[in-house]
Curated annotation (Swiss-Prot):
Pfam families named in the record: CID, Nrd1-Seb1_dom2, RRM_1
Matching PROSITE patterns: CID, RRM
Biased composition (Basic and acidic residues): 570-580
Gene3D superfamilies (UniProt xref): 1.25.40.90, 3.30.70.330
Subunit structure as annotated in this protein's UniProt entry: Interacts with rpb7.
Species of origin: Schizosaccharomyces pombe (strain 972 / ATCC 24843) (Fission yeast)
SUPFAM superfamilies per record: ENTH/VHS domain, RNA-binding domain, RBD
RRM domain sequence ranges: 406-478
Positions with biased composition (Low complexity): 361-374
Name by which UniProt lists this protein: Rpb7-binding protein seb1
Length: 620
């Protein structure tokens, strides 16, 4: 087995381990990189790709691997009297230089995605690098500044200090707050405090309104004041026996904790998803939304949020359930719509005629109610806990929806523009979901997790001189037909009749953007959803063939004729959505795989699929 193959094998084993940290394996990785220093570019590239694809709990371990290797390269270069100012590629100094190039990107990635408890450990790495003179002082100062800002924004709030804000002190000057009251930091985060969660359940359960006469006619189980045990409410939450006892003893006065009082929460936490009208929800739904946002703000995982909500509100129905567990509140599909819960995350059955994806039904056959208020359901929060945009817009034409793009088109991308540098430039405005560069066409596509971050980035980075080029940032189209988009604002108004089955599936099941599990309702505005490559043809791909092609009837669209310039169509064959709307070659065919890339609707064949991006150089 070659050194690089063994190296990658150890990284794979770390990825599937519990913490991603093993002293013996990190030592083995370091020894392999030192023994094969002539291949340092491949080793550092493997570390880079592993760190990008690693789970959030393993980001710290990836930095430990980088630290061990880069300092070993540094020591080797010093012993051989190699120059750090003019490094040679196949040498220790060359390996140190390549590792230094990816450090900023990997540390920034860990700051954004790793648990807040890991941030102090990353700060200690900076101290180690300073003592060993591993990196220049200005580089370390920049990393420290980012770390301290992140630690200040995620400082945990003490339940005890929140109960007496007038006596709270903050010697370090970076405590958290609830509403307008300052609170001192504590060593125990709220998300791991089972007693606090139980008190929140009790407070909201006792604040629930008395059901009306119409509601009393339906037999429902009594609403408990507090969950019977921590394990019953949150099965995966680690709880010490003493904590559970304290939770039972403290449940007698649940309202003594002002952290979870509904009257205080809206001062700093939205009372519902963006754009939702508070007057259209009843008291119980308002309490559910408030509690859900409180738990999400404390980084409680979505699965545990559902468990807590069910314990606090016996009549609570989760806004979205996995396939096989419950039903998504979708309108009754017609025979041509063929949208079922069991197929939301799997390949759909082929059309009975030719195996080509079914066309969406015409407006007259849609079983979507004309007036379905958002209050009928709460959109599922995004994986990072933020509420989704799901708002009614009276300016939207009938039987249409408005989609806010999160995709930016980047022009002027020469080979001097490297992915980590470009990513760090945009990460000043918010988290970058994915980034694809195509140096052959001198452009790229970048998707932000949130629309507001994309708006800031588009304005600030519209024309930015960089090296031998000028980076131009404009709005791109990541979802829906091109002709429906206003490229000056990044907003599309899409008639529902133009949405294909694949479009509808992505709108409902996307982790970011979309409806969050709610039905597709005319007149709503939402953010661009993530898509899955290879799960059916999209309206965007159809629009590339022209408006007339997108408007054809279902029977003609599902005909047996092959695409223009394409291979013959075989029964049951799946068609990929190929090309970007800015690509000069629309006949580019993606690789014959079914990769999942939630960041972009169209994957360029020159780049790997998924979140993993190549390092700033290509190993020879």
């Amino acid at each position: 087995m070659s050194g690089i193959a063994e190296f990658d094998g150890i990284l794979d084993s770390l990825e599937h381990s519990k913490t991603g940290i093993s002293g013996s394996k990190i030592l083995k990785l370091t020894n392999l990189s030192m023994e094969n220093v002539s291949e340092n570019a491949q080793f550092v590239a493997s570390v880079y790709k592993y760190a990008k694809r690693a789970p959030v709990t393993h980001k710290l371990g990836a930095l430990y691997i980088l630290d061990s290797i880069v300092r070993s390269f540094q020591d080797g270069a010093k012993k051989n009297n190699e120059s750090f100012e003019n490094p040679v590629d196949a040498s220790f100094s060359g390996g140190w230089c390549k590792a230094a190039e990816i450090t900023d990107s990997l540390v920034a990635d860990a700051i954004q995605h790793a648990p807040s408890a890991h941030l102090p450990k990353i700060l200690k790495l900076c101290d180690i690098w300073e003592k060993a003179s591993t990196f220049p002082p200005e580089k370390l100062e920049s990393l420290r500044s980012k770390l301290k800002d992140a630690m200040a924004s995620t400082e945990p709030v003490s339940v005890d200090s929140a109960a007496a804000p007038s006596q709270s002190t903050n010697p370090e000057g970076n405590g958290g707050s609830v509403g307008s009251q300052a609170a001192a930091p504590t060593s125990r985060p709220v998300e791991n405090d089972a007693a606090s969660i139980l008190e929140a359940l009790a407070a909201f359960a006792q604040k629930a309104p008395v059901p009306s006469a119409a509601e009393e006619s339906v037999s429902t189980p009594p609403q408990p004041a507090v969950a019977p045990s921590v394990s019953a409410v949150v099965p995966n939450l680690p709880v010490h026996p003493a904590t559970a006892i304290n939770a039972q003893s403290q449940s007698g006065n649940p309202l003594s904790n002002p952290l979870f009082q509904p009257s205080n929460v809206p001062q700093s936490i939205p009372s519902g998803p963006m754009g939702m009208k508070t007057g259209s929800v009843n008291d119980t739904q308002s309490q559910q939304i408030t509690l859900m946002n409180v738990l999400a703000s404390q980084n409680v995982p979505p699965a545990q949020i559902d468990s807590i909500m069910k314990a606090a509100f016996p009549n609570y129905n989760a806004p979205f359930q996995p396939a096989g567990v419950g039903s998504v509140p979708l309108p009754a599909p017609t025979s041509s719509q063929s949208l079922r819960l069991g197929s939301l995350h799997r390949s759909r059955s082929p059309s009975p005629r030719s195996g080509r994806p079914r066309r969406s039904p015409s407006p007259s056959h849609l079983s979507i109610p004309s007036t379905l208020p958002p209050a009928d359901g709460v959109p599922k929060p995004t994986p990072d806990g933020f509420p989704r945009r799901f708002e009614r817009d009276p300016t939207i034409p009938p039987d249409s929806i408005k989609v806010y793009s999160r995709t930016l088109f980047l022009g002027g991308i020469t080979r001097s523009v490297r992915e980590p540098v470009l990513r760090s430039m945009f990460e000043r405005f918010g988290s970058v979901q994915s980034l694809i560069l195509n140096h052959n066409y001198r452009h790229g596509f970048l998707k932000m997790f949130r629309r507001d971050a994309a708006e800031k980035a588009q304005v600030a980075m519209e024309n930015v001189p960089f090296a031998d080029t000028t980076i131009r940032t404009k709005w791109g189209v990541g979802f829906g037909p091109r002709e429906c988009s206003d490229f000056s604002t990044g907003i599309s108004v899409i008639p529902i009749r133009l949405l294909t089955d694949a479009d509808r599936t992505w709108l409902v099941t996307a982790e970011y953007g979309g409806t969050g599990g709610l039905p597709i309702t005319p007149g709503i505005a939402l953010d661009e959803p993530d898509i899955e490559i290879g799960l059916g043809i999209s309206s965007k791909a159809i629009s590339k063939r022209g408006k007339d092609f997108a408007m054809r009837r279902d029977e003609r669209f599902r005909g047996r004729k092959p695409y223009r310039g394409g291979p013959p169509i075989h029964h049951g064959e799946r068609h990929f959505d190929s090309g970007n709307d800015w690509h000069g070659n629309p006949s580019t065919v993606p690789p014959p795989t079914n990769p999942y890339n939630p960041g972009y609707p169209y994957m360029d064949p020159n780049y790997s699929s998924g979140y993993v991006s190549q390092p700033p150089w290509q190993p020879q």
